[in-house]
Amino acid sequence: MLDLPDIGLYRTTQPLPGHEDTIPAGVLVYVGQLANGGTKFVVRPADNRRNRWFWRDPTTPLRSPSWAKSLKKLPSEGFYTLPETLEFSGGARWVKGAIVELGYNGEGRGILFVAEWREDGTENVLYFSDRGMLIEDKLLERLVWAPILPTKNTQAAANE
């Protein structure tokens, strides 16, 4: 049995042999597995909606353990809290413990989107911009998972 990585997000550090044009070094990829424990595969992102990547065919079978070992594991997209206050030029800052959404660019670099509450809004919800801040890997590795419960829009579901 091949020694291949767990399912999840990764950044390539080397091109995939035989697929250098489609899976070069320095890109975001998803390692997945076919249903029922089938073959593992690697795929580049297709679409980004609401700061999250979505994947689709074609996928590439993952058969190179040596290349797989070169992948850099990335934390899951989703919600986290900041482990420290971040200061930005112009005096802006995001405080320690702020809720942020983690996403990635196509190169597999982390992007944070800070939660905002709109004082003049009518809904009791947090908003996340579609523009975030690139972060260094050392911060990426220290983010604290925020277990925010995903739900469906009950009003939209009732109207279906």
Predicted feature locations:
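Transition segments tied to proteolytic processing and entry into folded domains
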Residues: L2-G8, G18, A25, P147-T154
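Basic/aromatic-rich interaction segments and small domains that mediate binding to polyanionic partners
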Residues: R11-D57, S89-L134
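N-terminal helix-cap/turn-to-beta initiation motif at the start of protein domains
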Residues: M1-I7, K69-G78
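Intrinsically disordered, low-complexity, charged/polar segments
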Residues: R44-S76, F113-E160
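Short, solvent-exposed interaction modules
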Residues: K72-G90
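A short beta-strand micro-motif
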Residues: G8-T13, Y80-E84
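A general marker of short, structured functional hotspots
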Residues: D6, G26, S76, E84, ...
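Residue-level detector of functional hotspots within protein domains
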Residues: L2, P15, S66, L86
